[in-house]
């Protein structure tokens, strides 16, 4: 097993590295993760997406290698588009406790269907 595979397989989300946010100003962090992959829970075929993460930190920020490793843990998991984005959103919201957070998964088309999943802490439900 190569070192990257080992890091991904051994990554424990409970120990995700987060750092203190010492900034006094409110600001937005935007992270793009263009190589997300998970496996369809029905067929096992791979699904690919770009994940867009935006958040306004409060006391903590996520370390960039930690978020990369966490996202890569989905690579061999059988999980739906909806479940994967909701899990990422909930994990980061629980770990970082940001003032505001949004996670978007823009999935590559498969079978002529393009899916975008969005979770946001200030989501307004359309009527």
From Swiss-Prot:
This is NADPH-dependent 7-cyano-7-deazaguanine reductase. The gene is queF. InterPro entries: GTP-CH-I_C/QueF, NADPH_dep_7-cyano-7-deazaG_red, QueF, QueF_type1. Its EC number is 1.7.1.13. The active site is at 40 (thioimide intermediate), 47 (proton donor). One of its GO terms (biological process) is queuosine biosynthetic process. Gene3D superfamilies: 3.30.1130.10. Catalyzes the NADPH-dependent reduction of 7-cyano-7-deazaguanine (preQ0) to 7-aminomethyl-7-deazaguanine (preQ1). Substrate binds at residues 62-64, 81-82. It comes from the Bacteria. Belongs to the GTP cyclohydrolase I family. QueF type 1 subfamily. Pfam families: QueF. Signal peptide: none annotated. PANTHER family: NADPH-DEPENDENT 7-CYANO-7-DEAZAGUANINE REDUCTASE. It is found in: Cytoplasm. NCBIfam families: QueF-II. Keywords: Cytoplasm, NADP, Oxidoreductase, Queuosine biosynthesis. Pathway: tRNA modification; tRNA-queuosine biosynthesis. GO terms for molecular function: preQ1 synthase activity. The keyword Cytoplasm applies. HAMAP family: QueF_type1. One of its GO terms (cellular component) is cytoplasm.
């Amino acid at each position: 097993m190569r070192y990257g595979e080992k890091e991904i397989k051994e990554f424990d989300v409970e120990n995700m590295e987060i750092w203190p946010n010492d900034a006094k100003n409110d600001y937005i962090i935007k992270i793009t993760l263009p190589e997300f992959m998970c496996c369809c829970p029905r067929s096992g075929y791979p699904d690919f997406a770009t994940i867009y993460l935006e958040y306004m930190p409060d006391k903590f920020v996520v370390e960039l290698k930690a978020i990369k490793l966490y996202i890569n843990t989905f690579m061999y998991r059988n999980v739906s588009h909806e479940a994967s984005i909701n899990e990422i959103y909930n994990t980061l919201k629980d770990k970082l406790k940001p003032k505001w957070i949004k996670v978007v998964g823009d999935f590559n088309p498969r079978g002529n269907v393009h899916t975008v999943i969005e979770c946001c802490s200030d989501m307004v439900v359309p009527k």
